[in-house]
Amino acid sequence: MAISRSEVEHVAKLARLKFSQEEIEEFTVQLSKIIDYVNKLNELDTENVEPTAHIVPIHNVFREDEVKPSMDRDKILMNAPYKENGCFKVPKIIE
Amino acid sequence: MELYSLTIHELRELLKKREVSALEVTKSYLERIKEVEPKIDALITITEDFALQRAKEADEKIKNGEDTDLTGIPVIIKDNISTEGIKTTCSSKMLENYIPPYNATVVEKLLEEGVIILGKSNLDEFAMGSSTENSAFKTTKNPWDLSRVPGGSSGGSAAAIAADEAAFALGSDTGGSIRQPASLCGVVGMKPTYGLVSRYGLVAFASSLDQIGPFTKDVTDCAIVLNTIIGHDSKDSTSLKIDKPDYTSYLKEDIKGLRIGVAKEFFGEGIEEGVKETVQESIKVLQDLGAEIIDISIPYVEYALPAYYIIASAEASSNLARYDGIRYGHIAEKYEDLIDMYMVTRSEGFGKEVKRRIMLGTYALSSGYYDAYYKKALKVRTLIKNDFEKAFEKCDVIIGPTSPTVAFKIGERANDPLAMYLADIYTVSVNIAGLPGISIPCGLSDGLPVGLQIIGRHFDEGKILNVAYAFEQANKFNAKPQAIGGAR
Amino acid sequence: MKYEAVIGLEVHAELLTESKIFCSCTTKFGGEPNTHVCPVCLGLPGTLPVLNKKVVEYAVRAGLALNCTIANFSKMDRKNYFYPDLPKAYQISQYDLPLCSNGYVEIEVDGKVKKIGIKRIHIEEDAGKLLHENTDGSLVDYNRAGVPLIEIVSEPDMTTPEEAYQYLTKLKNILEYTEVSDCKMQEGSLRVDTNVSVRPVGSTELGTKIELKNLNSFRAVQKALEYEIKRQIKVLEEGGTIVQETRRWNESKGITEPMRTKEEAHDYRYFPEPDLVPIIVTDEWKEEIRKSLPEMPHHKRERFIAEYGLPEYDAKIITSSKKMADFFEKCVLEYDSPKTVSNWLMGEFSRLMNETGKEIDEVPVTPQMLVKLLKLIDNGVISGSIAKTVFEEMFGTGKEPEVIVEEKGLKQIANENELREIIKKVIVENPKSVEDYKNGKEKAMGFLVGQVMKATKGKANPQLTNQILKEELSK
């Protein structure tokens, strides 16, 4: 297997995904297959190749420092499942 | 002849001469939707009231002489493009009830022209897939054969145009999501150069690859829509400042002396014989029109698909991290604490393929694997980009099949992610290199459409349209899907 | 065994731009929750960031003032982690190519100058704010989400809490001088995290690093470090080992305590932000920014000595804060005795600021008000000692000095007859002192002046009092 069960569990946690034991099993098999497939890239020597993060070579795209009105709070909160006092509400966080 | 079966330019003539009203056009499409939608399931939302109201406004515009090429023309928009006040679900349970408070830039542009939005189309969840089977709500059927997929991820938009549910549609293309379904449904679909069309408002899948583009019934319509949707947008840092050409000026039948590259890599393993033959016949058509056919090679293109799956999944894992149920979207009902809320919410809200890609992407970016996967893929991206640049020294456009196969059966690849990924084998390299590409119908194989892909240099959409138009005029694709009945 | 500490500081400073780093919402502090929010800073699906040019300019300004190398090529990256205050679940920051690097600041400890290295300065967006007052849940306000920050990471060059304190003071001073941040810790526009480890003197190996949080003032940083260094040394001396952890400064108890953090190791999965393009700072741009730099502290200090004839000591103290220096110059513009102004600023003004913990711009006294007060003294309306009382009142209430003088009847008694009557009475009531004076004890004179002041509640004109007293005593 290109990826172990415990790695899958670790990655799931990093990604904030919860899986049943069967799903972990299934993902381990499927991800291993996919990883084996993408390992095809290792056939290539890329030692002296620069990575391309942006395909179109532009730089310095800025906006001027100008304030524009924000959005109405009603609209900002419109899709929030839980809200209170103009805020989004989440489970109690203990710091 | 039904109004709904007409192209944009045909409708435009009628509207301009006031032989029909935008309201009549809109009603014709709404009727058509009612008739065929139960068979193809292309739409998530139908905005009938909004459409009728917009149609009246369009008629006002026409009356006042304020109309343009798209005034009064009905459109269907892929449901991952933000529409103010209209649900934008991305075909995900996560966003089932999400109503954006803002419009995507392309939507703004269309609305300004007086375009009529009929509805939002189905897609593979968050645009991840090649068959539209990954939708959380419905499986769209191919209008040519209801037991087959329309392709994906913009399968809803492609099927809608093939079935005459709108005059044109918008889709998004990250690895082939416009061209591949266009090919499978027998319509015209274009992915413009990365940076030509604003991405503002397109729900991000893979930011460095995503691009919005049109589905149309012919090449002329493609040029017309392109004229409206392109252009620099100060809200998208990756959108480019270029002079806006009039793409309709490229719609010429003359391609004499044009150098057309045919890459052997686009006829490799997995290609169906029928597809191969149809495309080769198409190449002959172009040759007969006076184009020079040049054999070329793009050796690194076979690495485009694995590189794509790493880059796209890595970016997706980050882009989709915001779905946590706090500001919008699905939220779990039962959880233990904050972390558990995140985990349960996301596990309930996302479908399997989305989770698979988030997992792959998270893995590729995680400590210890970044260099081996993500950085490696970005380097391969450089090789592929250089490969195309070299190829374009020898030719003006590159052609080949859009998809190695015609539409496959629903369910056929649903449980084999890798087999599904192979559907994009001819399209992903174009996204990797940020190039423009079009798929136009070039014939039938076993009664199912075959798409011809034409790839150009950066910002060379004009030349692509020139070749596509010349081909279309010489080789009219008049076939219509029979499975839904009642076409022209 | 003798131990030494190794201290490194990470400072986050909010930049003084009008709008946020990636959208046009205001950066104003406060405001009703979620009223400075738009689809972009809320991270709604489909929205995209566009970088505020001023953020780059301000960061470069800070970099230049802190002697950094400015990167010609720089880029933005995504730092991925989940937290409710982070709307996109990633923070747009800079990873391997920060805008500025390899700088330093000079601090003075025990008369010696020491260079503290600055590893890097990068730009990033701030997160929102969690409010915990609610009982059954926490509330999120995204007004602050997307406010531009610079993170300034020092080299671990400090060895004592005092050095850390001096470094912070100097850094704050420079940031204020460059006008890139107002550095208000109480509003969270300046935040400090520190890393500290200890090792035997002479050792080159670093000890296990402890991160300290919840440091709400520079004094808190100093005190927390003092405590933490002692704690670590004690652990080592008792044969224990330091466990790598994050500890929280408990101000009221004066101790550091372990934070209850989730066990998992951070893996931020940084990668280049595909929605933003690289930043290229050309030499021309850099020079343009350099030219826009305001006068730096040491230049100002020299100018104050040359232009206003201030003693070096005064010039140093007055320029130790840009706000103080600005206040000074505004006063001097209308009042032609710089030394008098500096005396007031270093004296009463600083004393009351220290007592109240207020910054000069939080005090209601304006330069114009101080000048008015000084003129009241010069014109003989009030005495110098009454002026201190008046100033205290101004400091507390923001009232104009002449109003206070009027309301409280603090005008000097400069009427000779009136004063002579009071003095005569004092002489009669203090025969012993009169006797002493006549026997040559000069000190007795001071006592008698004091008695006059007491009788007039300090309002007696001092020169006149002296003159009349001498006249009466020689009778």
UniProtKB/Swiss-Prot annotation, chain A:
Family listed: Belongs to the GatC family.
Superkingdom to which the source organism belongs: Bacteria
Substrates-to-products reaction catalysed: L-glutamyl-tRNA(Gln) + L-glutamine + ATP + H2O = L-glutaminyl-tRNA(Gln) + L-glutamate + ADP + phosphate + H(+); L-aspartyl-tRNA(Asn) + L-glutamine + ATP + H2O = L-asparaginyl-tRNA(Asn) + L-glutamate + ADP + phosphate + 2 H(+)
GO annotation terms (biological process): glutaminyl-tRNAGln biosynthesis via transamidation; regulation of translational fidelity; translation
Job description of the protein: Allows the formation of correctly charged Asn-tRNA(Asn) or Gln-tRNA(Gln) through the transamidation of misacylated Asp-tRNA(Asn) or Glu-tRNA(Gln) in organisms which lack either or both of asparaginyl-tRNA or glutaminyl-tRNA synthetases. The reaction takes place in the presence of glutamine and ATP through an activated phospho-Asp-tRNA(Asn) or phospho-Glu-tRNA(Gln).
Assembly and interaction partners: Heterotrimer of A, B and C subunits.
EC number(s) reported in the record: 6.3.5.-
Enzyme class: ligase
MF terms in GO: asparaginyl-tRNA synthase (glutamine-hydrolyzing) activity; ATP binding; glutaminyl-tRNA synthase (glutamine-hydrolyzing) activity
Protein name per its UniProtKB record: Aspartyl/glutamyl-tRNA(Asn/Gln) amidotransferase subunit C
InterPro entries: Asp/Glu-ADT_sf_sub_c (IPR036113), GatC (IPR003837)
Keyword field: ATP-binding, Ligase, Nucleotide-binding, Protein biosynthesis
